[in-house]
Amino acid sequence: MASRHSAFYSPLLTCVRLLREDGHDAPYSVLAPGQQTYVLVRDGAVDIVQSAVSSNWKARERGVEPLPVHFAQINQRDGFFLAAREPDPAFEWKKLEGRTLLADQGDQPLAMLKYAVKHNGVDWARIKVLRKGEADYVHQQGPISSGEIVASVGASMPPVALSSLCCSRPYLKTGDPRVFVQTYGRAREWVRTAPAPEVAAAEAEFFPGVSQELLASTIQRYQDLGCWDGGIEIPRDLYEQALNVFQSVGGITWRHKYEEVVAAPPA
């Protein structure tokens, strides 16, 4: 299951495809409004979910237990972009001040955006942030079918432990995820290195109605950004950077220990 559906999660989509080609039962669905990943994992409704290490933090601060454990990295760069009505090759983040911005309200996308804004010397309070309607700039994940991309959030801030795969601790200990993890490692490396048009063609079934050209250009952007660089283990330093982001924008009350949220992928 995915908490969001996007080409940003191409390693997971390719893993699902490869598992199916190998004869495994590999259902794929997207989290519905009102559903919570930790509840679905806890109740055994799903085995493995695309989420983020940050999704554990607020729940932990509310005393929620048990929570999923994150065992494999998907992305180490934010995958959102800022789009404007017209091309602006001379765009600077300072241009956001005094303008309207339609921002994604998800906890992690918004935290990353606020951090990128601050990291680039912009006063968040001077931006008119909208939840709906039309704006001078739009903050969204790829593929982006309208507007002109003027900035990448991920390119405008340090690498960070972003999207990851999680499951229950008991399930991770069973050894059942081994085949999935082996296939996932192969899928992630292929998505990272294969020509973007080839990746787009292979995952076209997941994006009905999206042109191959748009999908390929989105994948190319993520490849160039280095979203899928590194191994599948969740690096401690990138986890700490994610904590830095959320702490900087007031998204967490305390720093959560790596071992309480992350585990190594099964060998």
Where are these regions (language model features)?
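Generic structural signal for individual residues within well-ordered alpha-helical segments
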Residues: Y38, E97, K128, R178-V181, ...
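N-terminal hydrophobic or amphipathic helices and topogenic motifs
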Residues: M1-P27, G34-Q35, R42, D229-A267
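Short, mixed-charge aromatic SLiMs
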Residues: Q35-T37, Y137, G209-V210, P265-A267
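Short, glycine-/small- and polar/acidic-enriched structural segments
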Residues: M1-Q141, S146-P159
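Short flexible/disordered coil segments
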Residues: A59-E61, P89-L96, V210-R221, G251-A267
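Pocket-lining segment of extracytoplasmic ligand-binding domains
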Residues: V129, D136-E205
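Periplasmic-binding protein-like
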Residues: I74-A84, A151-K173, V181, Q220-D224, ...
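Secondary-structure end/capping motifs
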Residues: K173-T253
